[in-house]
């Protein structure tokens, strides 16, 4: 009985030692949806938004003009520019991420339109640091907000044409 207890204690101590050496995963803080109001009528914003998505080569999964909803298929991007997937210890997660967008468009008045962009990001092919990215358990990622801001800048530019 004493030898068995000693072996279990040794095993538990070894596992604790291994766990102490691993770096904890720190998830990114998920931002709220990206919201802006555009000084243009609903129909003009809708047309410009659809054109902007086409320019970005975003595949549309569902679109409903009457309810003001556009949902994209998942598109790949690299972690860092548009996505933050957290870190392991002090090392940033690097690799690829799949991003899907849901965009809501709503008239605020005859001359103003509200646009909200929700993002859903997930990485299954990443590296812990600058190593080679490989398939791993999925990580939820957060948007940096850059893609959404660029999209609405493109919408505004198309409205000025």
Regions found by a protein language model. Give the residues of each.
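Classic N-terminal secretory signal peptides
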Residues: 11-16
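C-terminal motif of bacterial Sec signal peptides marking the signal peptidase cleavage site
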Residues: 18-20
């Amino acid at each position: 009985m004493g030898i068995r207890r000693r072996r279990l204690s040794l095993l538990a101590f070894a596992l604790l030692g291994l766990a102490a050496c691993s770096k904890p995963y720190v998830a990114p803080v998920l931002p709220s949806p990206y919201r802006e109001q555009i000084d243009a009528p609903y129909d003009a914003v809708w047309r410009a938004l659809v054109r902007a998505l086409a320019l970005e080569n975003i595949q549309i999964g569902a679109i409903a003009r009457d309810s003001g909803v556009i949902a994209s298929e998942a598109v790949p991007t690299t972690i860092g520019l548009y996505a933050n997937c957290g870190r392991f210890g002090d090392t940033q997660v690097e690799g690829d991420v799949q991003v899907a967008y849901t965009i809501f468009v709503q008239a605020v008045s005859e001359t103003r339109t509200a646009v909200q962009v929700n993002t859903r990001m997930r990485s299954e092919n990443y590296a812990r640091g600058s190593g080679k990215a490989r398939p791993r358990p999925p990580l939820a990622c957060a948007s940096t907000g850059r893609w959404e801001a660029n999209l609405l800048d493109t919408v505004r530019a198309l409205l000025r044409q």
